[in-house]
Amino acid sequence: MSEACPSCGLAVAGGTDGCQRLFDSIGLREYEDMRFARYHRIVVDVYAMQHPDRYGRSAKSFAAHLTGLCTWLENEAGAQSVNASVQRWLSGPSPVARPPLPPSYGALTIRELVEAEDPARYGEALRRWAQSTWNAYASLHVTARAWIATSLSYGNR
């Protein structure tokens, strides 16, 4: 019997545990099939932003995943460099506070990826899921971009 994951709303056998199993199976696919591996970081970021009480408890963890989501959607080509800059900034004494969460985390869930068998469809499904999640965090777009800008200037010191 399906029950809803209380964080993302996915109806799945086992609720929270079932949702986590889907996430783990996606990670396994990315590990076993290199055609999907390039998406691993953003899959983790999107899933974390839909499960912030588990994967974004600390302000720094939350900031890393929110900025990762922002960067991938707005500057995919530069995402690796920006993410490295954010990581350096967050590894230092950065004064980051976890902001209030939105009331929901997007209409789409990790289920979008489950049936995408080829990398092109997987990428398209991932982009839809990521965009849905990012849209849910509209109130934090300015914050994410400010954190990115701060991290980039931090690296130039």
Regions found by a protein language model. Name each.
Residues 1-157:
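Intrinsically disordered, low-complexity linkers and terminal regions
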